[in-house]
Amino acid sequence: MSRNYPRLDIETFGRHLITTGDLDPIYTALVRAEEAGDFSVPQLCRWLLGYWCYYHAGVASFLSEKEGEEFWHWMMVAARNEEETPAGGRWPRGHERRHYRAKIAVDSVTSLQARYGDRPENMALYVGARATEDERLPFRTVSARAQEHNGFGPWIGFKIADMMDRVMEVPVDFDNAAVFMFKDPEKAAMMLWEQREAHKYPENAKPKREAILSGVADYLIGRFADLAAPPLSDRPVNIQEVETVLCKWKSHMNGHYPLWNDIREINGGLEPWAGRCSAARAFLNHMPKEQ
């Protein structure tokens, strides 16, 4: 990937992500696929489970077409990674789930099958279960449920909570502590503060970390207050979207994230699968387009 591209300020960069679908293209494609009738709710839930394990849209699309015992068979084939995929080559893992392999993956799939039997879609339904339709779930509740599962740690617990809120329409309440417990958004927030605010303070009067992070979050939420949160557009942008903007902006400034990066990478991973399964073709069709 070329590092030769203009670096954008965080507001310009964030607005691009939010308004073009490049913030979380996976979320947009899933919501569109379900709304178009290409994915039923059970298939969507199986897609999510496959994605949370392997973090690859092509693999998740292929797995989503399988039900019951067949789903677990292919989940284990992917976990063991001893056979070629239907698209050719090894079973991929996204970078964020690169450690989900070998014994960790095999043990995880074994325990998931033991828990959910012939209804693998029940995993997603469990982590987002509510007592009433109007109940809002605390982030920590959803994350804790996710982390009950072998091979699921704090980071994927955060991602699952975010996807339950933005894709499955289960309202989840996040707070700054949930977002800034990971190093990338914290480093990005501190980098932005150094750019904008550090010169205003003597070195011995620098605010505490929590105050800096809270101030950056509030600042960005205010700057994006006129934008609706994708893909549902059901509320203004809040801390969840700010977390994604911060992470991607840090990569952007370090030369690893040109505009349209995620859309290009996801489409590239999907294309070999689109010729092998209808779910991958539908998903690819619903992906946001580079403009």
UniProtKB/Swiss-Prot annotation:
GO annotation terms (biological process): symbiont-mediated evasion of host restriction-modification system; symbiont-mediated suppression of host innate immune response
GO MF terms, alphabetically ordered: transferase activity
Keyword rRNA processing attached: no
Catalytic activity of the protein: 5-phosphomethyl-dUMP in DNA + glycine = 5-N(alpha)-glycyl-dTMP in DNA + phosphate
Keywords: Host-virus interaction, Inhibition of host innate immune response by virus, Restriction-modification system evasion by virus, Transferase, Viral immunoevasion
Residues at the active site: E243
UniProt family annotation: Belongs to the thymidine aminotransferase family.
Role, per record: Transfers glycine to 5-phosphomethyl-2'-deoxyuridine (5-PmdU) to produce 5-Nalpha-glycinylthymidine (Nalpha-GlyT) as a step in the pathway leading to thymidine hypermodifications in the viral genome. As a final result of the pathway of hypermodification, 5-aminoethyl-2'-deoxyuridine (5-NedU) substitutes for about 30% of thymidines in the viral DNA. These modifications probably prevent degradation of viral genome by the host restriction-modification antiviral defense system.
Record-given protein name: Glycinyltransferase
